[in-house]
């Protein structure tokens, strides 16, 4: 196991960290192996990078850029080889606030 120590005062109590496993945001500089820090309690805005999943079932979580079009949410990868996800039934699990990378 690997631990990431950060000052607790730097983040809200709803913050959480996860390891990026997908190439979906590579053109935005977010790579597999990076540690992403997200906030659960923030309200998502158009253009935010979010961690999301489909509301029904145990869907796969995706890190993508959020575009809001009325009641429709679009999740845009920053990787030209991947498609856009469009849905009215997405759960936003967190808003990306920081990326950490170990060299």
Question: Where are each of the predicted segments found?
Answer:
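Acidic/glycine-rich C-terminal interaction modules and beta/coil loop segments
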Residues: 2-103
